[in-house]
Curated annotation (Swiss-Prot):
Its EC number is 2.1.1.67. Substrate binds at F40. This is Thiopurine S-methyltransferase. The gene is TPMT. InterPro entries: SAM-dependent_MTases_sf, Thiopurine_S-MeTrfase, TPMT. It comes from Chlorocebus aethiops (Green monkey). GO terms for biological process: methylation.
Length: 245
């Protein structure tokens, strides 16, 4: 990579439509878990969240934090250990079970009667509830309003054609004075079809700008050796804070 391509000042790719017809099915996501193709999972948690977590929480306790497409994110334990309640949604039952096993947490499971085949897994301590279903089937009316969202790997995984529906779902879950931390990726989408999908700043404005103040907290070079196989030569990760207008 030449020096200009490693710069954090690389302009975002102007064509936001290039990936609009890309689709991954729920079955394909489940297969990724079964086949161990989960390089997106961060065993040590997300370092940008770790860096900004105390600023994000502002010393509060008892908050309700939502993890869309949660997988087995270790960050759920971070919030629970700080006295917050975690609600997650994940299509892979395997991912949910691995979370509880790897975090040494006992849990219960029960069916969600209004959603055929869906289940909810709850930690025995009661402060982590993970719903195994599609994000669009998530029983929103049952859980009440949430204070925070940590979206790392959700918006960038949702099929581009479903983003507006996804954003509206997220916003419908939030109560007053909400905060949302959102991570997205910037790269040349003509070279890699996704996922993770390319989400430029303009798309975040389109999806959330009417309801939210949007502030980019940090931008980092996220390019690793494995990303060369994607055909790209740079990858930036951006952390946004969305707050109620």
């Amino acid at each position: 990579m030449d020096g200009s391509r490693t710069s954090l000042d690389i302009e975002e790719y102007s064509n936001t439509e290039v990936q609009k017809n890309q689709v991954l099915t729920l079955e394909e996501w489940q297969d990724k878990w079964v086949n161990g193709k989960t390089a997106f999972h961060l065993e040590q948690g997300h370092q940008l969240l770790k860096k900004h977590l105390d600023t994000f929480l502002k010393g509060k306790s008892g908050l309700r934090v939502f993890f869309p497409l949660c997988g087995k994110a270790v960050e759920m334990k971070w919030f629970a250990n700080r006295g917050h309640s975690v609600v997650g949604v994940e299509i892979s039952e395997l991912g949910i079970r691995e979370f509880f096993t790897e975090q040494n947490l006992s849990y219960t499971e029960e069916p969600i009667t209004e959603i055929p085949g869906a289940k909810v897994f709850k930690s025995s301590s009661g402060n982590i509830s993970l719903y195994c279903c599609s994000i669009f089937d998530f029983p929103r009316t049952n859980i009440g309003k949430l204070d925070m969202i940590w979206d790392r790997g959700a918006l960038v995984a949702v099929n581009p054609g479903d983003r507006k529906r996804y954003a509206d779902t997220m916003l419908s879950l939030l109560g007053k004075k909400f905060q949302c931390l959102l991570c997205v990726f910037s790269y040349d989408p003509t070279k890699h079809p996704g996922p993770p999908f390319y989400v430029p700043h303009a798309e975040i404005e389109r999806l959330f700008g009417k309801i939210c103040n949007i502030h980019c907290l940090e931008k980092v070079d996220a390019f690793e050796e494995r990303h060369k196989s994607w055909g790209i030569d740079y990858l930036l990760e951006k952390l946004y804070l969305l707050t109620e207008k």
